[in-house]
C-alpha cells in the first residue's frame, strides 16, 4: 500500500504516465476507459441491497405504467429528491426511470459534503432545505437513518483576501441564523490538533455542517416517495422522447419511450447527470454541460482524526472529508480530464486515477495535515461529474420544448443542493414557477446561440471547474468563451481604452482605461493541455486589480465617469440590450395581461413596467414603447396593423425575458408574434445636463420639454441616419437613448462624440451605470428586484395598474399582499464612512439582524456607500413605513458594523427634477 509521501516522490521523478504503475496501483487510462472493480465507499452497500448483487440489467424492476403525470429520468440525487418533493406536493402518477440502479453513474461515488454557507442568499436557503431533509424530515417520515453525520466544517484561509471572503459569509449567515465562527490559527489548532496552522491567517468554523451518505439518502428518499404513491423503476433505460406540435406551433412532450414500452406523459424531468445531454438530444433540447473526471483518494486509518470537521482548503484547492477514522482527499485542478465520449454502458465503474493530475491535491493535503505524509492510500475514486459554463446547475423548463424540465449539471454539488433544488423543481413543475429566485439556475439564462456552441461550453466549463475554489470577487469576469457577441462599436471603443465585461456572450463596456488597450484574447486554458499561457496579458492584469474586497485602483477612473455624467454628459453603449417587437391580432390583450403597468397609451409613449408571475414576483422590469402602424421602413419600423410595441430589456436577461413572454403567450393562447431584433439594432444612451445641447446638433428634431417630453419616443434622423430616440434615463439625468440600425451605429456614435467634444462628453461603462443608478434608486433586476420580490415590496407600486379593473398576471397576489400587509420591504441605507460594500452584508436594526444587503455600491455624487436590502420584522408582523423609519440601523461588513441611515426615497434627487431637465 502506497503512502501519500511516496506518491509525491514517484510522481515527481517518473516520466508522465508511469507514476501510478510504479506505485503498484492501477495503470493510467488516458483514453478514459472505465474500470469496474474498485474498493470504494458505498460500492458494497449498493451491490448488496435486497435487489441483488448484480448490477447487470435484468429488465425493469416492475411493469411500466401506460401513463404518468410526470416521468423523472435518472435515479441520482436530483432525480430522487425531485420525485420525493413531487410526492410531498401530492402529485399522483409520478414515475422515476433509472437505466441501471439508483445512484449509478455519479451519485454513488460522490463525497457527500454539505456546507451551509455560500456567497449567495438563495444557495444558503437551498442548502438549508437539503440539510433539513437529510438530517430530520426523512428519518421522521420513514424511521430510517439517511447516513447524515454532523461533524462540522472548517474553511481554511492562508491569505487575507480569503479570510475576508469567509467573514463575508459569516455576516450573511447571521441573516439566516447559521452559526459560524472566525477562528485564529491557535483556536484552529485547538479544534483540529492534527492540522498545520503555521501558514494560516484564520479559519471559518461552521459547527452544523456535515456529510451525507449518497446510497442511504437516495434509498430513503425513494421509500418516502413510494409510500406516497410514486413509482421507482430500475433497469429501464429511456430510448426516446415523443413530441407533438400543437395548433399554435408549440412543441410539447407526449411520451417517454423505453425498450420495454412507452409511458404517455405531458411532463419529463431530465435528471440524467452526465448523460443529460444525450437525453436532451432525444427531444431536440440543448443541454450545455461537459463531463469530466473528478477524483478523490481514501486514506488508511489515521489516529486522532475521529470526529474532526470536514476541511476545505480553498487556496490549496483541496478538501478533506472525514470518513470514519480516515480521510477522503480531493479537489479541483487546472487541468481536469474531459470525458468526451460518454458511454451509455457506464454505471458503477470508475476511471483509473491520473496521478500526474491529482498530485497537486496530495501536496496541499500533506501541507495541511502533515500526518498524511506517512499515511497509506486505501482506495482511489475517479468517476464522471458534469460541469456547466457558469458552474451553476441547469434547471427549469427548456425553452425549446414545453413539458421538458431540466435538473442536471450540478458541478459536483448535486448532493448538497439536491434537497433545495428538488423542492424548487417540484414547485416549478406543479405551479409553473419555483418559490425562490432560481434565475441563476434557470436554463433560460443562456442565450440560445450559446447553448449548442461546443467551444464556448467547453472553455467556460473548464474555467468554472478550474476556478471552483477561487475567491468569489464581486467584479470578476471570465477569460474563457469571450468575444462571442460583439456590437458594431466594439473595435472603436476598444481603441479608446474600453475594458469590457461579458454578459451572456455579449462584450459590453465595463469602464474606460485611458492608459492602455486591453483586448480580450483567446482562452489559454491557464496553460493546460499544451496551450501556451498568455504573457503580459493586459486585460487579465487589469482584471486582477478587481481581486479585492476594497476599492480597486481604478475606483477613481469610475468616479470621473460618474461625475462627468452628473456635471456634463456621458455616452453609454448599451447595444447588448434585448430588443423585441410584440405584434399581432391580440397585441392589445397580450400587453394588458403581460405587463403590470398600463401600456395602453397613444403611439409615441414609452412606459417603464414590470412583468410578474402568478405569485406576484417580478420576472422582469423593462420599457415598452407604443408604436404607430404603417409600412415597414427598417428594423426600426416593422410593418403591422392594429397595435404594436417595442420592448427593451437588459441584455444579460434578454433570453429569460424572451422565454417568459413566449410562455405566457402560449399559455393564454394569444395570437401574437414576438420578434427579436436584438442583433439588428444598437443602442446608445447619452445622459447628463449637456445631453440636450449635444443631441440638438445631431438629431433633426426639437428636443425641448414641450416637443419631446420624458417617457416618449420619436423616429428621427441622427447625422442623416434613421434612429428611434427615446427620452429615458437609467442614471437619473436628462438624456435620450438612440436605438440605431447596426450599419448606422458607428457614424452615429462618431457624430455624437464630435458634437459632445465642446461639452465635456465622455465614454462611460456599466461600472458607472451601477453607481449612478443605485444613487438614484433605480432597481437592477436579479439584484434588488427578483422573481421572489413583488413590486409592492420593492417600492414599485407605481408600475402596477391596481387602480384600474384591468386583469394582469400576478394581480390577485398583489391585491392579497396589499390587503394583509407587506412582510418585508426594500430599504435604502447609506453609510457615512467611505467603506466598500458589494452585497451580502447583514442589516441590523435595534440590535437585531433583520435582513441582508442585496446590492451595494459607492455613490460618488453623494460621496457615500449606498446599500439596498429587504428587511423583516423579527416579530413576524407587517413591515410598515413607521417600522422602517423608527429604527437604528447598522450594516455588518466582514464582522465589523457601520452605522447606517435609512431612506424612504433615493438620497439623490428625490424629487425627480433632473430627468425632467430641471437643474
Curated annotation (Swiss-Prot):
GO terms for biological process: choline catabolic process; glycine biosynthetic process; sarcosine catabolic process; tetrahydrofolate interconversion. This is Sarcosine dehydrogenase, mitochondrial. The gene is Sardh. Catalyzes the last step of the oxidative degradation of choline to glycine. Converts sarcosine into glycine. It comes from Rattus norvegicus (Rat). It is an enzyme of class 1 (oxidoreductase). PANTHER family: AMINOMETHYLTRANSFERASE, SARCOSINE DEHYDROGENASE. It comes from the Eukaryota. Residues 1-22 form a transit peptide. SUPFAM superfamilies: Aminomethyltransferase beta-barrel domain, FAD-linked reductases, C-terminal domain, FAD/NAD(P)-binding domain, Folate-binding domain. Disulfide bonds: none annotated. Pathway: Amine and polyamine degradation; sarcosine degradation; formaldehyde and glycine from sarcosine: step 1/1. GO terms for molecular function: flavin adenine dinucleotide binding; folic acid binding; oxidoreductase activity; sarcosine dehydrogenase activity. Keywords: Acetylation, FAD, Flavoprotein, Mitochondrion, Oxidoreductase, Phosphoprotein, Transit peptide. The modification N6-acetyllysine is found at residues 174, 560, 776, 803, 885, 905. High levels in liver, lung, kidney, thymus and oviduct, and intermediate levels in the prostate, seminal vesicle, cardiac muscle and neuro-intermediate pituitary lobe. Also expressed in pancreas and adrenal gland. Its cofactor is FAD. The modification N6-succinyllysine is found at residues 38, 174, 378, 392, 535, 803, 885, 905. GO terms for cellular component: cytoplasm; mitochondrial matrix; mitochondrion.
Amino acid at each position: 500500500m502506497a503512502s501519500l509521501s511516496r506518491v509525491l516522490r514517484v510522481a515527481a521523478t517518473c516520466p508522465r504516465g508511469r507514476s501510478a504503475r510504479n506505485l503498484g496501483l492501477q495503470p493510467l487510462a488516458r483514453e478514459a476507459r472505465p474500470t469496474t472493480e474498485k474498493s470504494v465507499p458505498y460500492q458494497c452497500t449498493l451491490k448488496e441491497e435486497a435487489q441483488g448483487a448484480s448490477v447487470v440489467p435484468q429488465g425493469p424492476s416492475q411493469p411500466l405504467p401506460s401513463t404518468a403525470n410526470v416521468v423523472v429520468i435518472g435515479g441520482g440525487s436530483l432525480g430522487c429528491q425531485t420525485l420525493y418533493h413531487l410526492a410531498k406536493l401530492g402529485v399522483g402518477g409520478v414515475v422515476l426511470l433509472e437505466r441501471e440502479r439508483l445512484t449509478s453513474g455519479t451519485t454513488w461515488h460522490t463525497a457527500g459534503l454539505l456546507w451551509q454557507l455560500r456567497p449567495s442568499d438563495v444557495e444558503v436557503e437551498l442548502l438549508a432545505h437539503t440539510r433539513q431533509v437529510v438530517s430530520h424530515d426523512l428519518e421522521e417520515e420513514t424511521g430510517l437513518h439517511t447516513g447524515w453525520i454532523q461533524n462540522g466544517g472548517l474553511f481554511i484561509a492562508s491569505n487575507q483576501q480569503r479570510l475576508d471572503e469567509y467573514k463575508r459569509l459569516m455576516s450573511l449567515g447571521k441573516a439566516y441564523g447559521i452559526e459560524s465562527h472566525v477562528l485564529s490559527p491557535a483556536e484552529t489548532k485547538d479544534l483540529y490538533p492534527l492540522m498545520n496552522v503555521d501558514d494560516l491567517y484564520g479559519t471559518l468554523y461552521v459547527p452544523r455542517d456535515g456529510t451525507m451518505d449518497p446510497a442511504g439518502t437516495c434509498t430513503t428518499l425513494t421509500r418516502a416517495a413510494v409510500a406516497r404513491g410514486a413509482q421507482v423503476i430500475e433497469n429501464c433505460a429511456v430510448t426516446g422522447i415523443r413530441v407533438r406540435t400543437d395548433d399554435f406551433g408549440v412543441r410539447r412532450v407526449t411520451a417517454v419511450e423505453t425498450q420495454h414500452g412507452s409511458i404517455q406523459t405531458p411532463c419529463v424531468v431530465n435528471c440524467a447527470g452526465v448523460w443529460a445531454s444525450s437525453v436532451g438530444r432525444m427531444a431536440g433540447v440543448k443541454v450545455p454541460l461537459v463531463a469530466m473526471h473528478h477524483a478523490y483518494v481514501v486514506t488508511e486509518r489515521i489516529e486522532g482524526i475521529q470526529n474532526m470537521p470536514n476541511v476545505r482548503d480553498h487556496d490549496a484547492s483541496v478538501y478533506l472529508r472525514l470518513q470514519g477514522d480516515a480521510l477522503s482527499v480531493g479537489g479541483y485542478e487546472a487541468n481536469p480530464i474531459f470525458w468526451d465520449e460518454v458511454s451509455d454502458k457506464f454505471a458503477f465503474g470508475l476511471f483509473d486515477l491520473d496521478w500526474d493530475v491529482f498530485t497537486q491535491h496530495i501536496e496541499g493535503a500533506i501541507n495541511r495535515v502533515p500526518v498524511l505524509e506517512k499515511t497509506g492510500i486505501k482506495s482511489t475514486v475517479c468517476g464522471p461529474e458534469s460541469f456547466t459554463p457558469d458552474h451553476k446547475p441547469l434547471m427549469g423548463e427548456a425553452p425549446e420544448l414545453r413539458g421538458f424540465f431540466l435538473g442536471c449539471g450540478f458541478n459536483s454539488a448535486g448532493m448538497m443542493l439536491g434537497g433545495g433544488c428538488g423542492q424548487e423543481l417540484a414547485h416549478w413543475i406543479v405551479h409553473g414557477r419555483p418559490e425562490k429566485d432560481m434565475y441563476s439556475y434557470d436554463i433560460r439564462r443562456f442565450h440560445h446561440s450559446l447553448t449548442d456552441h461546443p467551444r464556448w461550453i467547453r472553455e467556460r466549463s473548464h474555467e468554472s471547474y478550474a476556478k471552483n475554489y477561487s475567491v468569489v470577487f464581486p467584479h470578476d469576469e471570465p477569460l474563457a468563451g469571450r468575444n462571442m457577441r460583439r456590437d458594431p462599436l466594439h473595435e472603436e471603443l476598444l481603441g479608446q481604452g474600453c475594458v469590457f465585461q461579458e454578459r451572456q456572450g455579449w462584450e459590453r463596456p465595463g469602464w474606460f482605461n485611458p492608459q492602455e488597450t486591453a483586448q480580450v484574447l483567446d482562452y489559454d486554458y491557464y496553460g493546460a493541455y499544451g496551450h501556451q499561457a498568455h504573457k503580459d496579458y493586459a486585460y487579465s492584469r487589469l482584471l486582477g486589480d478587481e481581486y479585492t474586497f476594497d476599492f480597486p485602483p481604478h475606483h477613481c477612473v469610475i468616479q470621473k465617469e460618474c461625475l462627468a455624467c452628473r456635471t456634463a454628459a456621458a455616452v453609454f453603449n448599451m447595444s447588448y440590450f434585448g430588443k423585441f417587437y410584440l405584434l399581432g391580432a391580440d397585441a392589445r390583450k397580450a400587453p394588458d395581461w403581460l405587463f403590470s403597468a398600463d401600456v395602453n397609451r397613444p403611439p409615441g409613449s414609452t412606459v417603464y413596467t414590470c412583468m410578474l408571475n402568478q405569485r406576484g414576483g417580478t420576472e422582469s422590469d423593462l420599457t415598452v414603447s407604443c408604436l404607430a402602424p404603417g409600412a415597414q421602413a427598417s428594423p426600426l419600423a416593422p410593418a403591422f396593423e392594429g397595435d404594436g410595441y417595442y420592448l427593451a430589456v437588459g441584455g444579460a436577461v434578454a433570453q429569460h425575458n424572451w422565454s417568459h413572454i413566449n410562455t405566457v403567450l402560449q399559455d393564454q393562447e394569444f395570437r401574437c408574434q414576438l420578434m427579436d431584433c436584438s442583433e439588428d439594432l444598437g443602442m446608445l444612451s447619452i445622459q447628463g445636463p449637456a445631453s440636450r445641447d449635444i443631441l440638438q446638433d445631431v438629431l433633426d428634431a426639437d428636443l425641448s420639454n414641450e416637443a419631446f417630453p420624458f417617457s416618449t419616443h420619436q423616429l428621427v434622423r441622427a447625422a442623416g441616419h434613421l434612429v428611434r430616440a427615446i427620452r429615458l434615463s437609467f442614471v437619473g439625468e436628462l438624456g435620450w437613448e438612440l436605438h440605431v440600425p447596426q450599419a448606422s451605429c458607428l457614424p452615429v456614435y462618431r457624430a455624437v462624440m464630435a458634437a459632445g467634444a465642446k461639452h465635456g462628453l465622455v465614454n462611460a461603462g456599466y461600472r458607472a451605470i451601477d453607481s449612478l443608478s443605485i444613487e438614484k434608486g433605480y432597481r437592477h433586476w436579479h439584484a434588488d428586484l427578483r422573481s421572489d420580490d413583488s413590486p409592492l415590496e420593492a417600492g414599485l407600486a407605481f408600475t402596477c395598474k391596481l387602480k384600474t379593473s384591468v386583469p394582469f398576471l400576478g394581480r390577485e397576489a398583489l391585491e392579497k399582499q396589499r390587503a394583509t400587509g407587506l412582510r418585508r420591504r426594500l430599504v435604502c441605507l447609506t453609510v457615512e464612512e467611505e467603506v466598500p460594500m458589494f452585497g451580502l452584508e447583514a442589516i441590523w436594526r435595534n440590535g437585531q439582524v433583520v435582513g441582508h444587503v442585496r446590492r451595494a455600491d459607492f455613490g460618488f455624487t453623494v460621496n457615500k456607500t449606498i446599500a439596498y436590502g429587504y428587511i423583516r420584522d423579527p416579530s413576524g408582523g407587517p413591515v410598515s413605513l413607521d417600522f422602517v423609519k423608527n429604527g437604528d440601523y447598522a450594516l455588518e461588513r466582514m464582522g465589523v458594523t457601520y452605522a447606517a441611515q435609512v431612506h424612504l426615497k433615493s438620497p439623490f434627487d428625490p424629487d425627480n427634477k433632473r430627468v425632467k431637465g430641471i437643474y
